[in-house]
A protein has these predicted regions:
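Rossmann-like dinucleotide/flavin-binding elements
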Residues: 1-66, 102-115, 119-165
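A conserved short coil-to-beta-strand element within the FAD-binding core of flavoproteins
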Residues: 1, 87-98
Length: 165
């Protein structure tokens, strides 16, 4: 049994948030591969805890999954606190504390950090739903197995599916 669970610390979200300002298992310079919802919110979280971040995004735009107002606020906050954000990047290697990449115009470059986090997105796994549908069962996909998004959308879709069943 871990010490945190013995004293109830890990049961308290508030306690965990406070502790994350004191200690985290990440270095001071963090490279985040992926500039979508997860990558940008992680960058924002880490900056609030005194980390330097560099976000590498393969696409041309950052935070496409975020609402416009939220995206603007996160991008502004990351930039305002010295976060580096690069788009059109193809990561070619992760070697120790260095991430090598190629820019959209073919230039090779690298960035160094103490920690690397992969936040390059997720793809829904539809195999179970597809197999059940193929077996003749009525399947309604909701949440991230339908499309990536916020929990509110998944809850609303589940409510609709329940009413229509």
């Amino acid at each position: 049994m871990k010490a945190g669970s013995l004293i109830g610390v890990t049961d308290s979200t508030e306690a965990m948030q406070k502790l994350s300002h004191v200690w985290m298992p990440l270095g001071k310079r963090v490279i985040i591969i992926g500039g979508g919802l997860v990558g940008l919110e992680l960058a924002e979280f880490l900056i609030a805890r005194g980390r330097q971040v560099c976000v590498l995004e393969s696409g041309t735009h950052l935070g496409r999954e975020l609402s416009i107002v939220r995206r603007w606020r996160v991008l502004h906050g990351v930039a305002e606190h010295g976060g580096q954000m690069l788009t059109g990047i193809t990561v070619t290697a992760i070697e120790g504390n260095r991430v090598r990449y190629q820019t959209a115009d073919g230039q090779s470059a690298d960035v160094r950090g103490d920690s690397v986090v992969l936040a390059s997105g997720a793809m829904p796994d539809t195999r179970l739903g597809d197999a059940l549908s193929s077996a003749g069962l009525n399947v309604t996909s909701i949440g991230d197995c339908q499309s990536l998004g916020y929990i509110e959308g998944a809850i609303a879709a589940g409510h609709r599916a329940g009413r229509e069943a």
